[in-house]
Amino acid sequence: ITWNDLDLDAVFDTVDHTVSVCGEEYLYTALRMPVTTTEIREERERLMKLFAENQKAREAVQKALLLMGKEKMNPPTEEIAVLMEAEPGEKGKYLLMAGIAVLGIGLLFVLPPLGVAVLFASMVGNGLMHGRESKKLESALKAFGCILRLQRTARELGKEKISGLEMYQKRLEEQEKQLRPITRKCRTLVNTKESQGGAANMIFAYFHTFFLLDLIEYSSVVSGVKSYEKAILQMAEDLGLLDFALSAASYRESLSYYCRPEFLDEKKAGCRINVEELYHPLLTHPVANSLYAEGGILLTGSNASGKSTFMKNMAVNAIL
């Protein structure tokens, strides 16, 4: 049975109550690759119960996750993958060409004709260099913005101690502090690009172009961010798990009734299945079915009697 056989795109749209791109990605992954580890399932259930019963925790976490958002945004893992594969560029060359521009300014006060010539050559050379190399920067800016949102969300989540989330808050706080050296540089690059427009900002942008400052900063960030990959991805996963649990708790509250699937060890419990009042989450007016069977069974019925729907129903509910 495949993802399309179970119409899991529609299932995803139905159960998706997430408010951040981290939670959206975590939910999609949870449907794509259901976990069999008891510890992970139990921790997810604990968080769902916490959010269902604790309004203060629910509102505090959701408020923080809204800072991350999910409009027109790629999943964090995709954005970070872009940075991991990005070429940092030739920082030494950028520094040399910026140094020549500074030298030209200095020569204006000693040998004006030579200074003008050096400045003109730097203006042309650095402009061409910036135009050619800035494509790398443009593709990385969204990833830098994603890192900044992750950090801002983690910082907001740590402002208020929430009972039951101490482990996540502590880990996110540690990761947020660990990322500060690199996020300062990310912020400089993002702010420079976002502030374009207006005479003062145009002068500021030209200043960065003339001295290749954003390319120098970009090279430093890309070279340094690779050592923070584990912390960034762990931060995205932790935030995603919290949003996922919030979403699942919200979805459960929208249902007339639900239960937790209980999976038994076949060697200990044998091959059996027991379901009561099972219904498909995509049907508006479903007819619930119950079944108890041990060993193999033969499911029969006339055409269009619901055999396939029942089998898909079993699979979808096992995943959910």
Language model features with spans:
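Alpha-helical coupling/stalk and coiled-coil linker elements that connect catalytic or binding modules
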Residues: 1-305, 310-313
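Post-Walker A helix-loop "phosphate-sensing" segment adjacent to the P-loop in P-loop NTPases
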Residues: 316-320
